[in-house]
C-alpha cells in the first residue's frame, strides 16, 4: 500500500520523537507547516506545557504581507527566538515534525539561529 505525503510525514515524525524530547533546560522547538501559515512553539515535554508560541498568523496581525513562504518562515524563526530570549531560553532541540529539513522548515531554523537561539 502506498503512503500519501502526510502519512509518510507522520511515520517520520514518530521515528524522530522517539529520539528527541525537550526538558526545562533545553526545550523542544516544534515547527508545523500548513498551506497558509507556519507555526512554531517551544515545548517542555517533562511538564507537557507550551512555553512560547508564534506563527505567521500572529505576525501578520502586526505586519503587512507576511505569508507562509520562506521570508515569512524566517520571520517566525526570529520571532520565536526573541520570545524565547525573553523567557531566558538559550538553547533548544529542533523538532522538524517529520518535514524534510529544506525550504520553509530550514528558513525557520536559520531565522532562529540568526536571532541567537542555539540548537
Swiss-Prot record:
<dbReference type="Pfam" id="PF00861">
    <property type="entry name" value="Ribosomal_L18p"/>
</dbReference>
<dbReference type="GO" id="GO:0022625">
    <property type="term" value="C:cytosolic large ribosomal subunit"/>
</dbReference>
<comment type="function">
    <text>This is one of the proteins that bind and probably mediate the attachment of the 5S RNA into the large ribosomal subunit, where it forms part of the central protuberance.</text>
</comment>
<dbReference type="GO" id="GO:0008097">
    <property type="term" value="F:5S rRNA binding"/>
</dbReference>
<protein>
    <recommendedName>
        <fullName>Large ribosomal subunit protein uL18</fullName>
    </recommendedName>
</protein>
<comment type="subunit">
    <text>Part of the 50S ribosomal subunit; part of the 5S rRNA/L5/L18/L25 subcomplex. Contacts the 5S and 23S rRNAs.</text>
</comment>
<dbReference type="InterPro" id="IPR005484">
    <property type="entry name" value="Ribosomal_uL18_bac/euk"/>
</dbReference>
<dbReference type="GO" id="GO:0006412">
    <property type="term" value="P:translation"/>
</dbReference>
<dbReference type="GO" id="GO:0003735">
    <property type="term" value="F:structural constituent of ribosome"/>
</dbReference>
<dbReference type="InterPro" id="IPR004389">
    <property type="entry name" value="Ribosomal_uL18_bac-type"/>
</dbReference>
<keyword id="KW-0687">Ribonucleoprotein</keyword>
<keyword id="KW-0699">rRNA-binding</keyword>
<comment type="similarity">
    <text>Belongs to the universal ribosomal protein uL18 family.</text>
</comment>
<keyword id="KW-0689">Ribosomal protein</keyword>
<keyword id="KW-0694">RNA-binding</keyword>
Amino acid at each position: 500500500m502506498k503512503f500519501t505525503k502526510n502519512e509518510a510525514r507522520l511515520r517520520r515524525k514518530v521515528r524522530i520523537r522517539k529520539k528527541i524530547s525537550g526538558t526545562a533546560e533545553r526545550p523542544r522547538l516544534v515547527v508545523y507547516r500548513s498551506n497558509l501559515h507556519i507555526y512554531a512553539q517551544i515545548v517542555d515535554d517533562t511538564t507537557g506545557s507550551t512555553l512560547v508560541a508564534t506563527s505567521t498568523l500572529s505576525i501578520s496581525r502586526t505586519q503587512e504581507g507576511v505569508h507562509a513562504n520562506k521570508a515569512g518562515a524566517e520571520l517566525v524563526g526570529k520571532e520565536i527566538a526573541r520570545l524565547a530570549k525573553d523567557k531566558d531560553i538559550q538553547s533548544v532541540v529542533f523538532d522538524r515534525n517529520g518535514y524534510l529539513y529544506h525550504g520553509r522548515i530550514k528558513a525557520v531554523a536559520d531565522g532562529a539561529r540568526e536571532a541567537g537561539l542555539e540548537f
